[in-house]
Regions:
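Short acidic/proline- and small/hydrophobic-mixed sequence motifs that coincide with surface turns
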Residues: 33-36, 51
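Asparagine-centered strand-capping/turn motif at beta-strand->loop junctions
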Residues: 26-31
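Surface-exposed loop/edge segments in extracytoplasmic proteins
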Residues: 48-55
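Transition segment at domain starts
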Residues: 1-19
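Beta-strand signatures of extracellular beta-sandwich domains
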Residues: 38-42
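Terminal connector regions
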Residues: 55, 71-95
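Short proline/glycine- and polar residue-rich coil/turn motifs
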Residues: 59-66
Length: 95
């Protein structure tokens, strides 16, 4: 998934307890510092219809060209997923 300054490389997985999660890395392809990136994960059925939503946060800060791991619990597994960045905090990097 590419959303301008962010790129997401994620997939469905299972938590240690066996529950479905969507996990991966979010990349800050922009030039400034960002922190606490909020994500919306939409669970889709085989026809592309949204059958569930979950929100999570990639906690911590990232400089430009950095990445951060995230893991968002899902209500149920789906055929595919759509991921969107909802919001983020910015900070000065002194560059």
């Amino acid at each position: 998934m590419v959303a301008g300054r962010f790129r997401i490389d994620g997939r469905e997985a299972q938590s240690k307890r066996g529950s479905p999660v969507y996990s991966g890395y979010i990349y800050n392809d922009g030039g400034g510092g960002v922190a606490n990136v909020r994500l919306l994960i939409e669970t889709l059925d085989a026809e592309g219809k949204v059958i569930g939503e979950a929100q999570g946060t990639a906690l911590g800060s990232m400089l430009g060209r950095d990445r951060r791991y995230f893991e968002v619990p899902l209500q149920a597994a789906g055929a595919s997923y759509r991921v969107r960045v909802l919001s983020w905090d910015t900070f000065a990097t002194g560059q």
